[in-house]
């Protein structure tokens, strides 16, 4: 059904972004491929939230936007660690933080999905630090 399709496309968006991770790639390349895949499937990308660097602190620079233009943004370097975690909506991209200051919903109350992985840039590309044992990535098939 429509809700499972949203979940599947969101995972595909994340994987498409992850497939670009390697030294020299730019953050705008990752955001662009995610946005392009979401929008080509008639979904929107949440812009108020993004992936983030991970280091001594949990949420650090750089911000990893899930939309953007290719050839823009910070260039990736070996050793960088960050999340790719697109939030993809059935309706409009705007979201709303509820009074508990934690729960986020879409303003139009349509469904949203999110997938997340933590990525380490290696000299050869990517190591996925949050990989599930049974998970096979599209670029490995």
Segments from the language model and where they lie:
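Active-site neighborhoods and metal-handling regions in enzymes and metal-associated proteins
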Residues: 1-141
């Amino acid at each position: 059904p429509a809700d499972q399709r949203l979940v599947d496309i969101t995972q595909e968006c994340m994987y498409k972004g992850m497939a670009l991770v390697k030294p020299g790639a730019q953050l705008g390349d990752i955001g662009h491929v995610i946005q392009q895949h979401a929008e080509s499937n008639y979904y929107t990308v949440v812009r108020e939230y993004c992936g983030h660097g991970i280091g001594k602190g949990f949420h650090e620079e750089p911000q990893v936007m899930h939309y953007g233009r290719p050839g823009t943004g910070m260039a990736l370097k070996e050793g960088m660690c960050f999340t790719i975690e697109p939030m993809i909506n059935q309706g409009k991209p705007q979201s709303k933080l509820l009074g508990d200051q934690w729960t986020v919903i879409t303003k139009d109350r349509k469904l949203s999905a999110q997938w997340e992985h933590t990525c380490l840039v290696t000299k050869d590309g990517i190591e996925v630090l949050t990989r599930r044992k049974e998970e096979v990535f599209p670029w490995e098939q």
